[in-house]
Regions:
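Extended, highly charged linker/hinge segments and catalytic-adjacent loops that couple domains
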Residues: 162, 166-167, 176-178, 182, ...
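Conserved short loop/turn motifs at secondary-structure junctions
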Residues: 2-3, 105-110, 194-199, 288-296, ...
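Flexible glycine-/small-residue-rich
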Residues: 8-9, 44-46, 108, 179, ...
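Intrinsically disordered, low-complexity regulatory segments
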Residues: 1-173, 177-181, 257, 261, ...
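Long, highly charged, low-complexity internal segments
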Residues: 39-41, 49-82, 94, 197-328, ...
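A generic secondary-structure signal for well-formed alpha-helical elements
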Residues: 21-25, 124-129, 157, 182, ...
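Short, surface-exposed helix-loop/turn micro-motifs enriched in polar/charged residues
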Residues: 109, 113, 131, 137, ...
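C-terminal or mid-to-C-terminal helical accessory/interaction module adjacent to the motor/catalytic core
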Residues: 77, 90, 98-99, 144-235, ...
């Protein structure tokens, strides 16, 4: 009997898929690296199992890192196993090559990296053929509840639908390699021009991030403190006393980043304002107008990390770990590793159901 191999991105997701499918697909037997039922085999990666590399003839050794050997642009990219997960890769490839497995389902995370993880595994398993040649479908999950998983299996996407995302993922991976290899070798050659070997790594994300840190550090070192003055006062009103602070209503931003509407640079200016208003009557007008404010967009990962850092002091890594746990273990969030701040249109019924559940919970 032919079977379908489902490849998830991590073991916990594979277990969730098995739990969700059991009521409709029957009992699954558990083995060391996979689950199997009458119709399905479910296994998982543990993140990236395969990485790209240049063909061996393009691998310039350290002693030849010079501008004369740049740029390195191989005509193709080969694949190699990630060292620490070789055994896992072998287990997944073994299931993919089974003769009774006639089609594959990519159940890796719903994003560019999830697409790449599966594609590289499938390509590696196919060897020189560049793939196994078996039909592929995509399980696209925004939520990890059992019903959401079953709905996902009822609405599998075709391989052709995912080709654009797969191309984007592969392009990003290969571009990162080209930037990293050529940039690192060029900067290392430049910094080693007077002798020795001074490894200077370059990366698409690493280098701009390092630049931000350096720029900030330079501003901190160049900062010179300046005294400024504020005018604070207590006001007596019919309803009682309240505190207030002077500000310049005509203030406009300038090239001076330290200038603010409530700051004065001269003590005599502050004293003059205080003397002019001390003990003087004044009229205060309070106005309120109705306004309509649109609700904020949903969080993407970056905005969630920024909010959690500002409110709770969480690092980006801590926020991601918490969000991932709420998504995978507690089924309380949609997929967190997203750069989108909107849900797909077909998610409207689920959103309504969630709001009804929250309303009934008394939260």
């Amino acid at each position: 009997m032919s079977k379908t191999l489902v490849i998830a991105e991590k073991p916990s997701v594979a277990q969730d898929i098995v739990r969700a499918l059991t009521p409709i697909a029957g009992k699954f037997d558990k083995y060391d690296d996979y689950f199997e039922s009458e119709h399905y085999v479910v296994t998982s990666a543990v993140g990236h199992l395969v990485e790209i590399q240049a063909p061996e003839e393009f691998d310039v050794k350290r002693g030849k890192w010079s501008f004369a050997h740049l740029p390195v642009i191989p005509p193709r990219f080969d694949l190699k196993p990630v060292d620490k997960t070789k055994s896992r890769l072998a287990a997944v490839v073994k299931q993919a090559k089974r003769k009774d497995v006639t089609q594959l389902i990519n159940a890796c995370d719903a994003g560019r990296e999830g697409e790449l993880i599966f594609r590289l595994i499938e390509q590696y398993a196919g060897g020189a053929k560049g793939g196994l040649g078996k039909p592929i479908q995509r399980l696209w999950l925004q939520s990890m509840t059992p019903q959401a998983i079953r709905d996902g299996f009822n609405n599998l996407r075709s391989d052709a639908q995912m080709q654009g995302l797969a191309d984007a993922a592969r392009s990003r991976s290969e571009a990162d390699w080209l930037v990293g290899i050529n940039g690192t070798r060029a900067m290392t050659a430049f910094n080693s021009r007077d002798g020795g070997f001074f490894l200077t790594t370059v990366g698409r994300v690493q280098t701009p991030t390092l630049s931000l840190i350096v720029t900030r550090e330079e501003k901190i070192r160049a900062f010179q403190s300046r005294d400024y003055f504020e005018v604070h006062a207590n006001f007596a009103a019919q309803a009682g006393q309240y505190a207030g602070k002077w500000f310049d209503p005509k203030f406009k931003k300038s090239d001076d980043p330290e200038a603010k509407a409530d700051r004065l640079w001269k003590a005599e200016d502050a004293q003059a304002i205080a003397s002019a208003v001390q003990g003087q009557p004044a009229t205060v007008t309070e106005e309120s107008k109705p306004s309509t404010q649109a609700s904020p967009l949903l969080f993407d990962l970056t905005s969630l990390q920024r909010e959690a850092n500002g409110k709770f002091g969480f690092s980006a890594k801590t926020t991601l770990a918490l969000a991932q746990s709420l998504y995978e273990r507690h089924k309380a969030l949609t997929y967190p590793r997203t750069d989108s701040r909107a849900l797909p249109e077909d998610y409207l019924p689920v959103a309504k159901q969630t709001f009804e559940m929250l309303a009934d919970s008394g939260m």
